[in-house]
Amino acid sequence: MTNSIRIGTRKSPLALIQTNLVIQQIKQFFPDINCEIVPIITSGDLIQNKPLYDIGGKALFLKEIEQALLDKKIDLAVHSLKDVPGRIPEELVIAAILEREDPRDVFVCLNYKSIEELPQNAVIGSSAVRRKAFIQKIRSDLKVTVFRGNIDSRIKKLMTAEVDATILAYAGLKRLRAFNPEYCHLIEYSQMLPCIGQGVIAVEIRQDDNAMLEICNQINHLPTFELIKPERAFLEYLDANCRTPIAAYSKYLDADNIQTDFMLGNLDCSKIIFHTEVTDINTSKEAGIKAAKMMLNQLDK
């Protein structure tokens, strides 16, 4: 067993908090291992003035970190699973998942408590086409404008009235201790399905690194690992990018069965399809692929 681990992560406050959550899990099982955090600036962090879909998608938050992993400059990487594309380099693997935080979205607004309450033609700041699709479904009059940056910077922009409202993930707000019920309002799943993998912290390693695999096997939260399989299979089959409105949310019906709600839209968000699959744990990945095939056919009609 190794005595030291180099852990690659983005430099944002949220990324560092999430990395420390992983370290806490490692220390529970391997208290004598030294964990060194290696902050890495990614292309996604550097380019803030353009929508992700114009510059390469969420993979830009992983590119430099995964390269450091491939170059053996780090031993494992910590990501928000929602930023991980359906397909990753074949030499790498998502080997551990931490227990999922509440994956719901949050409506953040100083003067109103819901999207429905916003005045006519109000402006919502969001760069996610998934959120744009749901916003337009709820209120077609609203304007959605590009709104990037970390959680703190987005809330500051909201406070200075650059936009009327924004939408953020609850998990990030909670981990940063930035969820304020005075202006943060949870959005139910029935109104807005989460991003695939939202609320989940993922650990990525090299496929052939047995020492890291042993550690990941210990810290992996198996119920969550199984739960996100249909979501990830759906994403992988579609090979979706940041231009595609796509969402999925899985939950346990009982110890052996999973229900997954899927959403897929066309590029201009004018057509949105929903579908639900119920499957046992052993076939949940196949359910995600089945849903992707069926919904893709419906979208093309």
Curated annotation (Swiss-Prot):
Gene Ontology cellular-component annotations: cytoplasm
Transferase recorded as keyword: yes
InterPro entries hit by this protein: HemC (IPR000860), Porphobilin_deaminase_cofac_BS (IPR022419), Porphobilin_deaminase_N (IPR022417), Porphobilinogen_deaminase_C (IPR022418), Porphobilinogen_deaminase_C_sf (IPR036803)
Enzyme Commission number(s): 2.5.1.61
Cofactor: dipyrromethane
Pfam annotation, one family: Porphobil_deamC
Any one GO biological process: protoporphyrinogen IX biosynthetic process
Keywords from the named record: Porphyrin biosynthesis, Transferase
Comment on bound cofactor: Binds 1 dipyrromethane group covalently.
Pathway note: Porphyrin-containing compound metabolism; protoporphyrin-IX biosynthesis; coproporphyrinogen-III from 5-aminolevulinate: step 2/4
Catalytic activity: 4 porphobilinogen + H2O = hydroxymethylbilane + 4 NH4(+)
Residue list for modification S-(dipyrrolylmethanemethyl)cysteine: C242
Organism domain of life: Bacteria
GO MF annotation list: hydroxymethylbilane synthase activity
Protein purpose: Tetrapolymerization of the monopyrrole PBG into the hydroxymethylbilane pre-uroporphyrinogen in several discrete steps.
HAMAP family per record: Porphobil_deam
Additional note from the record: The porphobilinogen subunits are added to the dipyrromethane group.
Family annotation (PANTHER family): PORPHOBILINOGEN DEAMINASE
Family: Belongs to the HMBS family.
Complex and partners: Monomer.
Name of this chain's protein: Porphobilinogen deaminase
Organism per entry: Rickettsia felis (strain ATCC VR-1525 / URRWXCal2) (Rickettsia azadi)
Organism placement in taxonomy: Bacteria, Pseudomonadati, Pseudomonadota, Alphaproteobacteria, Rickettsiales
